[in-house]
């Protein structure tokens, strides 16, 4: 029996020799290191079995829900991958995690008893985790640790429910909560792709339609429609109230971000860790909507990673599952669930048709945010800055210059000279003459000194910006020493692990 986890460990080590993996020594080392730990686990289980004269058994238990979830995840990753190359680059990472989870789960079961059960379950667990959080290659060993924590929680943290022992926490959401909390507390968010994941999911063409359509399969099979309906309806009501009070939109340019809509459809709809009754599931969804909305406002206010809003509340809701079932009502299934599926579809059609959901939200208008900023509405200036930055990176180069002016002046927003210099350089490099004309003045009027001070304090981004502004013909008049100083600053940025700087130097 132990040949199976040993073979999985061998498969994991083999993945380290793929060109895309081998090109990153820390990533390859994490694959090999985890394969070695699994092999050691095999030896440990074998020794424990001999000491206790045990016969290990394995049962393959295919669960319909798991292979349906797997199919949904494949479709979702495919749509996402067609709009962001990062998904294709991450495929070896996902395969490695699946091999690791299968092996770790088997070894954990055999360490604790004679029989292990397996099926398709590890695939959607890994898929769900990777819809929200990836670690950078330099820290990818933490991704395996995250999965191990989830497996341990599923195996060890139980309660009595409906006459049987079952796990309390969703094996995806619990480790996501734990790791996100630690990352935030230690100011280590830079170690992950969490923000890029949240942003790029909203760039999928027809993202909300795809998420809704795939979510229908989950809702129909698991009878979790009321969870999703409750969450989305609550977020809609809170958005309306927010706009009524502040005159602006909470999530800037969309009613519910795609990443949060994904959470409403897939993260909190695990039937094993959510309430079983119709009233309980509706309340569960309402509480999720309230928690996500409140967490977003709070994280934004304290300067935390607002993209963790959908992840930090789920384990606490899992703990309420049995209490919420005491609200009474019939089980959430059968024809009643199909009725709620139809009602949810009608509600989605209304929200999508009114542009509350989807890519055509009224908050897409830069003029709206400029006027709101001039009127000093709540968070309007920071939202305007965010919108300008997004438009800049979508190829509207004039918006880069506007963003630079906004952050250089420091009138409506806190002055941020590294950001201003970056956007001036980007606009100038793309041929915007007016931005090029501003650079010399920006450097002479305190920009160079501010960037140099930040660079000397080991801010790699400032080193890169200053080096970029000094390089080439961006900063007139000519300076014979400028090229050498520019290269030195960019080299320092590369030393400080700014990948764009290393790319600039060809390293």
Locate the predicted segments by residue.
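Internal/C-terminal transmembrane anchor helices
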Residues: 334-359
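Short helix-capping/linker turns of helical repeat alpha-solenoids
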Residues: 375-378, 388-389, 394-397, 403, ...
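N-terminal signal-anchor module of multipass membrane proteins
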Residues: 1-110, 356
């Amino acid at each position: 029996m132990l040949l199976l986890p040993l073979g999985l460990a061998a498969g994991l080590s083999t993945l380290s020799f793929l060109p895309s993996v081998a090109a990153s020594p820390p990533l390859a080392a994490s694959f090999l290191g985890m394969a070695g730990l699994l092999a050691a686990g095999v030896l440990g289980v074998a020794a424990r079995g001999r000491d206790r004269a045990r016969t290990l058994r394995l049962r393959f238990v295919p669960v319909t829900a798991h292979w349906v979830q797997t199919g949904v995840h494949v479709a979702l990753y495919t749509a996402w991958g067609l709009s962001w190359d990062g998904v294709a680059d991450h495929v070896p990472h996902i395969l490695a995690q699946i091999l690791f989870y299968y092996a770790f789960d088997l070894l954990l079961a055999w360490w604790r008893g004679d029989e292990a059960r397996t099926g398709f379950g590890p695939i959607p667990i890994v898929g769900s985790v990777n819809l929200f959080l990836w670690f950078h290659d330099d820290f990818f060993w933490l991704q395996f640790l995250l999965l191990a924590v989830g497996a341990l929680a599923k195996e060890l943290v139980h309660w009595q429910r409906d006459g049987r022992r079952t796990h309390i926490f969703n094996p995806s959401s619990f480790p996501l909560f734990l790791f996100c909390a630690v990352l935030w507390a230690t100011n280590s968010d830079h170690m992950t792709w969490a923000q890029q994941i949240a942003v790029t999911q909203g760039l999928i063409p027809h993202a909300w339609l795809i998420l809704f359509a795939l979510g229908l399969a989950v809702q129909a099979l698991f009878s979790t429609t009321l969870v999703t309906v409750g969450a989305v309806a609550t977020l809609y009501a809170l958005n309306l109230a927010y706009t009524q009070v502040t005159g602006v939109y909470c999530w800037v340019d969309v009613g519910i971000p795609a990443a949060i809509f994904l959470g409403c459809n897939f993260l909190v709809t695990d039937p094993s860790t959510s309430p079983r009754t119709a009233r309980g599931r509706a309340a569960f969804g309402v509480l999720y909507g309230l928690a996500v909305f409140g967490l977003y406002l709070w994280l934004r206010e304290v300067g935390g990673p607002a993209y963790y809003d959908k992840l930090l509340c789920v384990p606490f809701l899992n703990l309420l599952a049995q209490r919420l079932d005491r609200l009474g009502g019939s089980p959430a299934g059968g024809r009643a669930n199909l009725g709620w599926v139809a009602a949810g579809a009608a509600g989605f059609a209304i929200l999508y048709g009114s542009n509350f959901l989807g890519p055509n939200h009224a908050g897409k208008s830069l003029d709206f945010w400029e006027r709101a900023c001039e009127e000093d509405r709540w968070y309007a200036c920071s939202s305007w800055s965010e919108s300008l930055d997004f438009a800049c990176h979508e190829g509207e180069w004039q918006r880069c210059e506007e963003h630079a002016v906004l952050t250089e002046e420091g009138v409506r927003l806190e002055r941020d000279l590294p950001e201003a210099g970056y956007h001036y350089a980007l606009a100038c490099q793309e041929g915007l003459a007016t931005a090029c004309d501003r650079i010399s003045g920006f450097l002479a009027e305190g920009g160079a000194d501010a960037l140099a001070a930040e660079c000397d304090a080991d801010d790699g981004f400032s080193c890169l910006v200053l080096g970029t502004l000094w390089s080439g013909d961006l900063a007139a008049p000519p300076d014979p020493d400028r090229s050498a100083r520019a290269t030195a600053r960019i080299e320092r940025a590369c030393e400080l692990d700014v990948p764009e700087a290393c790319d600039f130097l060809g390293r």
